[in-house]
Amino acid sequence: FMSSREQILDAIRQSLGRPELSTDAKRALNQQITSHPANLVPARAKGERAQLIKQFQNMAQAAACTVETVSNLVAVPAAVSQFLRANNLPTRITLAPDEWLSGLDWNSNNLLKTKIGSADIADMVSVTPAFAGVAETGTLVASSGSAHPTTLNFVPDYHVVVLRHTQIVGSYEEVWARLRKANKQGRGFTVP
C-alpha cells in the first residue's frame, strides 16, 4: 500500500518517464542528503576576514544595498535614524523581537518611534538582525522564528538589516554549516 505522498511522487516519476530508483541509488541519495557534502566554493569566497568583509560590501552595494559601517552595536540606532532622515523615510520602525537587537537603546534617539513584533501592512520600515552575510554574492541571510518574524523581511517597503562583521562568511556552504549548528543547539532557525 502506498501513502498519498508516495502516490504523488510515483505519478510525477511516471509522467517524467523515469524508472523507479534502484536500492543502491536510493541509498546513495539518502547518504548525500544526510552527509551534507560541500559544493565547489569559488575563489572570491575565500580569503582573510578583511577581504571577505570588503567583498561582501562590494557585492551588496552592486545589488543596490546601502552599506553603513558603525564602530560598535551601540551606534546602530543612531545610524538607522540618520539613514532614515537622509533618505526622507518614516522614522516609525518595527524591530524584530530579537534579544540583542531589542536590547539596544532605541529610545536614545528622540526621532525614532519603535514597535517590537511582526510587521503588518502599515509598517514601512523594519529592522532585523541578519543570520549571516555571504561574501561570495553579497547576500544577506535572514532567519525566521519567534524572535525573527518573517513578515519583517518582506512586508515593509524598507528593510534595515544589522549584520556583525563576525557573521560574514565566504560561501553559502559556511551558512548551511552555521544553520545546522544553530538548529542542533535548539535555536530552531529556518531560512525563509
Functional labels for PLM-detected ranges:
Residues 1-192:
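The feature marks the mature, well-folded catalytic cores of soluble enzymes
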